[in-house]
């Protein structure tokens, strides 16, 4: 079955072969890895385990610190890693403002920084980031479209929601804002594959009213209709709002809803059969390729400003494996 066990799609295969610098050199290198949490989803536990494996294979040292979902702890962790004199920082952002301040401090200390999973605003803050290791947003839209082509009836409509997590409706972003660019790429990837592979399915883009309160559910209720077969939500908040709106309209069982963000809530929605799936970077590839990329930087190699990683379509069939849990029936 195409989508079983993550339905892995390799977006960009990045292999540096043997690590960029020799094992003898790597033994003297220490990489600091900051993650938002090691709880709830299993996502970051898997990411850090693969990062540790990649560091061990290269004889490099890896220091892993969790922010426990607290920006204050994230700030302390970044300050501690910089004070400890790590050779490079890998950061999966929890709080953008905290990360920007941490990157600025690392830049001043001449410590190269790579971001994992998510970007932060760089233009106004003038921070320097060696590379962003993350999912290709266009490929996220393409994989979502492939799912809709296989699971939504011909003649149906797919609604693509355009919204950025944490922003209110009156917030204006520049066209070149990294969040706007990424969202546009997702929608373009979605549109291109639907048009080429299942032209009988109509794509409708919807601008959402707000993204953080109950008004979004009311807005979405007006966007959903009897002919809607699928909804693409670019973040967890919109996915959960869509679920509430579909349930209120008594359409939840007939609409396939996909999210493009892993959160404890979206994973729980898959497990309770309220959410069809999540399109996400695999934590394994983020951890492995993140370490490989930072070692290449430390070895003096030129790396791309953005390095794409593997994608997964997480469904009810693969959610336990994605969490790093056994799915054998009867096991606890």
What are these regions (language model features)?
Residues 96-139, 147-150, 157, 161-172, ...:
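Flexible loop/hinge segments that line or gate small-molecule binding clefts
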Residues 42-58, 140-144, 169-201, 215, ...:
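Short, solvent-exposed amphipathic alpha-helices that sit
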Residues 91-108, 190, 205-268:
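Hydrophobic alpha-helical
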Residues 1-30, 104-111, 153, 327-332:
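Short, low-complexity disordered leader/linker segments with a strong preference
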Residues 30-54, 58, 63-76, 86, ...:
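Extracytoplasmic "Venus flytrap"
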Residues 72-86, 214-227:
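Short, well-structured alpha-helical segments in soluble
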Residues 27-29, 169-171, 175, 194, ...:
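Hinge/cleft segment of the Venus flytrap/periplasmic-binding protein
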Residues 74, 132-159, 215-217, 262-266, ...:
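Hydrophobic alpha-helical segments within soluble ligand-binding/sensing domains
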């Amino acid at each position: 079955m195409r989508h079983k066990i993550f339905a892995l799609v390799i977006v960009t295969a990045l292999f540096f072969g043997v690590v960029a610098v020799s094992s003898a050199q790597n033994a003297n290198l220490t990489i600091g890895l900051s993650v938002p949490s090691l709880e709830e989803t299993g996502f970051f536990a898997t990411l850090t385990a693969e990062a540790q494996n990649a560091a061990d294979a290269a004889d490099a040292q890896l220091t892993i610190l969790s922010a426990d979902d607290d920006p204050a702890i994230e700030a302390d962790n970044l300050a501690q890693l910089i004070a400890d004199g790590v050779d490079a920082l890998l950061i999966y952002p929890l709080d953008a403002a905290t990360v920007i301040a941490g990157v600025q401090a690392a830049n001043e200390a001449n410590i190269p920084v790579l971001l994992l999973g998510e970007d932060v605003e760089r233009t106004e803050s003038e921070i320097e980031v060696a590379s962003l290791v993350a999912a290709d947003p266009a490929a996220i839209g393409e994989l979502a479209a492939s799912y809709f082509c296989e699971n939504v009836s011909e003649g149906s409509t797919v609604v693509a929601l355009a919204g950025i997590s944490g922003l209110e409706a009156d917030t204006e972003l520049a066209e070149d804002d990294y969040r706007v660019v990424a969202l546009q790429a997702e929608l373009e990837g979605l549109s291109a594959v639907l048009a080429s592979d299942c032209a009988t399915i109509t794509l409708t883009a919807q601008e959402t009213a707000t993204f953080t309160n109950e008004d979004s559910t009311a807005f979405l209720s007006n966007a959903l209709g009897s002919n809607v077969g699928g909804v693409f939500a670019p973040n967890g908040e919109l996915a959960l709002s869509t679920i509430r709106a579909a349930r209120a309209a008594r359409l939840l069982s007939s609409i396939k809803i996909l999210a493009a963000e892993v959160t404890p809530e979206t994973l729980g929605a898959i497990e309770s059969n309220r959410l069809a799936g999540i399109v996400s970077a695999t934590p394994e590839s983020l951890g492995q390729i993140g370490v490989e990329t930072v070692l290449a930087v430390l070895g003096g190699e030129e790396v791309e400003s953005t390095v794409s990683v593997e994608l997964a379509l997480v469904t009810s069939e693969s959610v336990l494996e994605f969490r790093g849990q056994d799915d054998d029936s009867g096991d606890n």
